[in-house]
């Protein structure tokens, strides 16, 4: 018989840098999960993606065991990295703070495709382009 899921916890953590300090400790501790075991497994799985924020979805079972799924980094993180900027514009209507090329946009769309609600790279590119526009990042041809 399958184990019963008692909680699903969603966190966004730096790749390879999970530790028992907040936000990880309190979020997992209240469900009785072994925090150090999670940190070691998460860091091992994400060590090749250093410098990125990796969202994780942790399923906690009634016997206090857990499984987790790592997602792709948020589009905004990938766009700021590609554009070489620290953060997006506070007011995207007034002007752009950077730009990315179509090739970079396509690369980001291919990376994000498994987590987006679309099936083609073309539609994924339109979604990512909209995110870039809202951040004040121009897409050049």
Swiss-Prot record:
Annotated keywords: Methylation, Ribonucleoprotein, Ribosomal protein, RNA-binding, rRNA-binding
Gene that this polypeptide is encoded by: rplK
Subunit structure: Part of the ribosomal stalk of the 50S ribosomal subunit. Interacts with L10 and the large rRNA to form the base of the stalk. L10 forms an elongated spine to which L12 dimers bind in a sequential fashion forming a multimeric L10(L12)X complex.
Domain of life (superkingdom): Bacteria
Stored SMART domains: RL11
GO CC term, one of those recorded: cytosolic large ribosomal subunit
Signal peptide interval: none
Family: Belongs to the universal ribosomal protein uL11 family.
PANTHER family: 60S RIBOSOMAL PROTEIN L12, LARGE RIBOSOMAL SUBUNIT PROTEIN UL11M
Protein function: Forms part of the ribosomal stalk which helps the ribosome interact with GTP-bound translation factors.
InterPro entries reported in the protein's UniProt record: Ribosomal_uL11, Ribosomal_uL11_bac-typ, Ribosomal_uL11_C, Ribosomal_uL11_C_sf, Ribosomal_uL11_CS, Ribosomal_uL11_N, Ribosomal_uL11_N_sf
Organism: Synechococcus sp. (strain CC9902)
One GO MF term: large ribosomal subunit rRNA binding
Pfam families registered for this protein in UniProt: Ribosomal_L11 (PF00298), Ribosomal_L11_N (PF03946)
Biological-process GO terms, alphabetical: translation
Keyword RNA-binding found: yes
PTM section of the record: One or more lysine residues are methylated.
PROSITE patterns attached to this UniProt entry: RIBOSOMAL_L11
Keyword Transmembrane listed: no
Identification of the protein by name: Large ribosomal subunit protein uL11
